[in-house]
A protein has these predicted regions:
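Short acidic, Pro/Gly- and aromatic-enriched capping/linker segments at domain boundaries
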Residues: 134-154
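Polysaccharide-binding surfaces and accessory modules of carbohydrate-active proteins
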Residues: 1-131, 147
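Short Pro-Gly-centered flexible turn/kink motifs
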Residues: 151-170
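Glycine-rich, aromatic-flanked loop segments that form ligand/cofactor-binding clefts
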Residues: 99-129, 168-189, 223, 227-234, ...
Length: 276
């Protein structure tokens, strides 16, 4: 814990760092409070600021759109600022992801080179700022997006930023990714060390074209393959507006009788008989 106090104003910022040596992961966040007589408005409040000294930096980010999820792109970070942000609120990760990779001296690679992976524990509007200064050093600033996010902080109230979780590797992004996986299983996921059920989703097999008999056969095949769970995807609903394509049916949440005359209960029975 590092405590910072302003010399002129009754404002304090506490920097928190938790290290997980076994997983080689660090979790960090900030707390802000003040003792002014009236509330103070916070306009910017980063989770942390990381500062690197090197010769070359390469950023890998992930953009998305419908049916084009996680499009990876890499670019060098040169003098000035590069910002990744979103203002979509609850759909924050629709077009860009709150996750990035950094490569030092070369683009991040799977099995070699120095790499850093980072993500923010925040599902709303976020902002990552990467700034290379006049002497070639790099600042990384992960934060809640300050756009329309001013916060009125009352005296002696504590404002806590989202956590920023990151890891380093000298052996590429593969090792760094496994670090984060291990950390998530050990400290973040409920029952992270437990067994996970395998799942068969019918979408890539049937798309919108299925009926009760076909789904029942898929469930039997799922059990034969050792799969534990069957997931019925799109196309099961709509009578007035049948969901036979992706341009109809949304909002008509009745089970489609032409495809599933027995309704969901018939599928449940088929699943029980198949043992999934």
């Amino acid at each position: 814990i590092i405590q910072l106090k302003d010399n002129q104003y009754p404002v304090e910022v506490t920097l928190h760092y938790i290290a997980y040596p076994k997983e080689n992961v660090i979790k960090t966040w900030s707390e802000i409070k003040h003792a002014e007589k009236k509330p103070v408005t916070l306009w910017r409040y980063a989770s942390t600021m990381l500062y690197f000294s090197g010769n070359e930096y390469y950023l890998t980010e992930f953009s998305s759109d419908w049916a084009k999820e996680a499009q990876m792109s890499t670019q060098p970070l040169l003098f000035g600022k590069k910002v990744i942000d979103t203002k979509l609120g609850s759909r924050a990760a629709m077009h860009t992801h709150p996750f990035f990779e950094l490569g030092f001296e070369q683009p991040a690679q799977e099995a070699q080179g120095r790499a850093m992976l980072g993500t923010i524990g925040w599902t709303g509007n976020f902002q990552f700022t990467f700034e290379v200064d006049n002497v070639g050093n790099l600042r990384v600033i992960p934060a809640i997006n300050p756009y329309a996010s001013d916060y009125e902080l009352k005296p002696n109230e504590v404002f806590t930023t989202p956590e920023f979780i990151f890891t380093f590797s000298n052996n590429g992004t593969g090792e760094a990714s496994r670090n984060l996986h291990a950390w998530a299983r050990n400290y973040q996921l409920k029952d992270g060390q437990g067994d996970r059920m395998t799942l068969l989703n019918n979408w890539e097999n049937t798309y919108f074209k299925f009926n009760e008999e076909l789904l029942a056969e898929l469930m039997k095949e799922a059990k034969h393959l050792g799969v534990d769970m069957f997931l019925l995807d799109d196309g099961w609903f709509g009578n007035k507006h049948p969901r036979n394509s992706d341009n109809a049916g949304l909002g008509d949440w009745e089970v489609m009788r032409s495809k599933l005359p027995g309704g969901i209960p018939a599928l449940v029975q088929s699943a029980k008989e198949a043992g999934v």
